[in-house]
Amino acid sequence: MAISAGASALGLVSSMPSGPGVIDDRLIAEIAASVPPPIATFLLTARVDAEAIAEQHAGCRTSTLQLVDFVAPPQLVRLRRLLPSVELVQVIHVADEDSLEEARLAAPLVDALLLDSGNPNLPVKELGGTGRTHDWRISRRIRDEAGVRVFLAGGINAANVGEAIAAVQPFGIDLCSSVREAGRLSAARLEAFMRSVHAAPKL
């Protein structure tokens, strides 16, 4: 459904402490194997140890790893050595000025950053799918400084995607909750979102 609506990548959500859309790793592997290039497949993982991430990826075989919790720089270096041909995308949960420093630490070690609105500091971590926006002014600063591709996520929907693109000028948009209805992807919401994207300033 997402591909036919015009998506250029699929995010496949593995086990998470919270949030929507979780599917089994075996199903992730099946989907990843069936998606034709140039559509990218993203494995969303909450693991933070390089060996554990690489082990999970070996069973899923996506083109890209989306690291939804902050992975320490030494682990990113190790992960790059373990998976040199897999794209690494580090999620930065934009809360305050500290997010800028996290982005500066991660950017030289990954292929892209993804700016989201979770809260990893809660007793039950929020690592995505919150439906909340964040301070796009901080996101724009990260985008301007990063030196790598920057994706924008967090509460983006058909009504605000044009404003989000204008404010941050990201490489791409990541979305989840705004195109779901009763926990499942909604064709109508996807179509409305894509119409808004096409009407917005070009990414």
Can you say where each PLM-predicted feature lies in the sequence?
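Conserved N-terminal beta1-alpha1 strand-loop-helix module at the mouth
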Residues: M1-G172, S177-L203
